[in-house]
Amino acid sequence: MVEFSSEEKTILIQHAIKKYENEETLIEKLKTILSEKDIQRNIDTLIGTQRVRRIGPEVLQNNESHTELPELPDNLKSTIENL
C-alpha cells in the first residue's frame, strides 16, 4: 500500500464518498489503498467535524452545504479515478 499523509487520506475518502455513497461499497473500494482502520477512523472524523453526514444506515454524503469539498491534488487524481 502507498503511504498517504493524514490530510491525503481525508481528501481521498471525501472524494471517494462523492463517487460511492454506499458505505459498504466505499469501504470495499478503499480497502485496496487504505487499511480498514484508517478508513473507519477518517469516516468517523469527517462525520464528527460535520464534513460528511450519514443519511440512513448505509449512505454517506459530503456535507457540501457546511463545508466545500477540498480540491483533489494531482498526485491523488489517478488514485480516485482507479477506485
Language-model region placement:
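Minor-groove-contacting beta-hairpin "wing" of winged helix-turn-helix DNA-binding domains
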Residues: 58-67
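A short, conserved structural fragment
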Residues: 47-58
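Short, amphipathic alpha-helical interaction segments positioned at domain boundaries
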Residues: 66-83
